[in-house]
Amino acid sequence: MHQSLTQQRSSDMSLPDSMGAFNRRKRNSIYVTVTLLIVSVLILTVGLAATTRTQNVTVGGYYPGVILGFGSFLGIIGSNLIENKRQMLVASIVFISFGVIAAFCCAIVDGVFAARHIDLKPLYANRCHYVPKTSQKEAEEVITSSSKITPSTRALRNLTQAVKEVNCPQLSRGLCTPRIRGNTCFCCDLYNCGNRVEITGGYYEYIDVSSCQDIIHLYHLLWSATILNIVGLFLGIITAAVLGGFKDMNPTRPALNCSVENAHPTVSYYARPQVASYNTYYHSPPHLPPYSAYDFQHSGVFPSSPPSGLSDEQEPQSPSPSPSYMWSSSAPPRYSPPYYPPFEKPPPYSP
């Protein structure tokens, strides 16, 4: 009984601790998923800004932002659920895992592209020229128009005038004259004459830009997307680990508290009568004689003479019943079992 009460008291003390651990895990899960969602939005924003900066440079750094953002959104919803918490958190962990892989790949691709294929030295030296859209129209009209002057000669002359503003003396030859589009930032120092492969390692033209300063912005956006993908990589791993430890935790149900509260009156109710009945039975005199109603109904079969060996003086003082209630030799066996309390003399037996 003592042990059961101690166990009930220890279980009552452990309920606030379990609820505190559950709330602490839930709070940590929400914190990391919200942080991952913010990083995912930044990755998506920077990646879209970088990939829409130019037409011929494609950036894939925004794909991890979409996957990680969706996984973190599922994690926030699953952390606030009770019934379907495990299913939502498992789906969130799966999406976050794919987002971590995508962030790792995109960080490598964008970092290598920004380091090897974008050279800012000609831009800082003002050796790149921006060709507006009007120059492209004039060049196309010159090339496609038919006149007495041969198209090649007129095209070379107009393109040479346009290229002279770029300060590219090697482009004055006919074989090395490029076709420059409108809204293009062209860097002649990075262009290999007559070779389509850029051995110098950089893009020599950037199409559909507003100015050559957009190339510098593109370079910074690529490195920003690379850094954010690395941050999303490690934060996604941490978030998946936190959600994996939280998905199997359940809050303490109210039914457990009710069962613990009902255990106290049950123990006190059954414990006290047992002790009272034990003391009353063994330490108090009996309220009824150890004879049944059958003995009193058939009292005529008993002899009226007192038992042998007892005098008249001892008869009133004896705690035994009256001699008229004694059994005779021809009487049937007794109905009640011959049990006598301790410290009391049993009645004599007469054959």
Swiss-Prot record:
<feature type="region of interest" description="Disordered">
    <location>
        <begin position="302"/>
        <end position="331"/>
    </location>
</feature>
<comment type="similarity">
    <text>Belongs to the TMEM255 family.</text>
</comment>
<keyword id="KW-0472">Membrane</keyword>
<dbReference type="GO" id="GO:0009617">
    <property type="term" value="P:response to bacterium"/>
</dbReference>
<feature type="transmembrane region" description="Helical">
    <location>
        <begin position="57"/>
        <end position="77"/>
    </location>
</feature>
<feature type="transmembrane region" description="Helical">
    <location>
        <begin position="226"/>
        <end position="246"/>
    </location>
</feature>
<protein>
    <recommendedName>
        <fullName>Transmembrane protein 255A</fullName>
    </recommendedName>
</protein>
<dbReference type="GO" id="GO:0016020">
    <property type="term" value="C:membrane"/>
</dbReference>
<keyword id="KW-0812">Transmembrane</keyword>
<dbReference type="InterPro" id="IPR028014">
    <property type="entry name" value="TMEM255"/>
</dbReference>
<feature type="transmembrane region" description="Helical">
    <location>
        <begin position="89"/>
        <end position="109"/>
    </location>
</feature>
<dbReference type="Pfam" id="PF14967">
    <property type="entry name" value="FAM70"/>
</dbReference>
<keyword id="KW-1133">Transmembrane helix</keyword>
<feature type="transmembrane region" description="Helical">
    <location>
        <begin position="30"/>
        <end position="50"/>
    </location>
</feature>
